[in-house]
Structure formats: C-alpha cells, structure tokens
Amino acid sequence: AFFYNAIFFTYALILTDFYGVASGHVGWYILPFAIGNFLGPLLLGRLFDTRGRRPMIAFTYIVSGILLALTGWLFLRNLIDETTQTVCWMVIFFFGSAAAGSAYLTVSETFPLEIRALAIAFFYAVGTGVGGIVAPWLFGVLIDTGSRMSVFAGYLTAAILMVLAGCVAWRWGVDAERKPLESIAKPLTFLD
C-alpha cells in the first residue's frame, strides 16, 4: 500500500511541479497508469496458480522494486519526460498491482476458513491505513522541497521495501497453488 499510494496520490504533483504539465491535462497521464494497473492482474493472474504463488509474488514485488529504483534514478538525472515517466509507471504498476492483489489473497489462505475474511480485512486495513496515510504525506513533503534528490530518496525507500517484501514472500510464502484451501489451513472446526 505504501508503494501504490506513494506514487498514485502524488503523481499529479510530479507531473505539474517537475514536468510543467497543466493540471487540466493530468488525467491523460493517469489513464495509462490505470491501464497498467488493470492489465497486470488480468494478464499475470493465472500465472500465480500455474507457476506458483510464492515465486510469482516474489517476482512481481522484486521486479516492481527494481523498476521503481531505475525509474527514480532516471527521474533524478532528468533523463525522462512526462511521457516516458508515465510509461515507466505503467510498466511498474503492471507488476506491482498484480503483486499487491495476490499478496492479500495469499495472506488470507494461511488462515482457517472461519477467520479468512477477517484476515483479509485486517491486513487490507492495516496496509491501506499505513500506506494510505504515511506515503502520500511523506511524498507530498518530498515533492514540496522541489528537489529531485528528495523525491528519488522516497522512490528508493519504496523500491527497497518492495524488494524486501519480495524476498520475504520467497522465503516464507505459502505454496498454495492448485491445493484445496483446507489443506493449507485446517478449519477451526476440523476433527482428526
């Protein structure tokens, strides 16, 4: 949530403050961003069941983080414009939205049936609460400095968090693909 909210809720500020895009034209840049968010889960989703959840979650988180760090570096060096920045975000969130969506579902699969919905709600609320409050505020402060270096530091922090999350998923993730959920987490009412 930190990664997504940091970028999405401050994207308009990046476009207007650093690239001089008129505020009335920002929506045209957000549309491709939204397309990447939609296509990622749509096209990668089935691979989480065929290739495996754990490797795919790790892959999508790590790729998102690496691409964010690279895009941040290009932004820092002023090597991209508003169009290439948008293409970069589209590609990053193609992978990132698939990662985030699958992670919530995988977390829920490790809990017994009776509390599965509660687990999803809890992890979503905590992730969105922390990421939805802290990330836009922090990136708003960084953008307000007018310094590309400050914004890059924020991007790099988010990138590191994504790569670390991918490593955690690889190490401790659950291989839940093609298995009945009850074999992963027995129902609380299960009798031996």
Give residue ranges: language-model regions.
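Interfacial helix-cap and linker-helix signal at transmembrane-aqueous boundaries
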Residues: 15-16, 47-48, 138-147
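C-terminal ends and interior cores of transmembrane alpha-helices
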Residues: 63-79
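A membrane-interface helix-boundary motif in multi-pass transporters
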Residues: 141-160
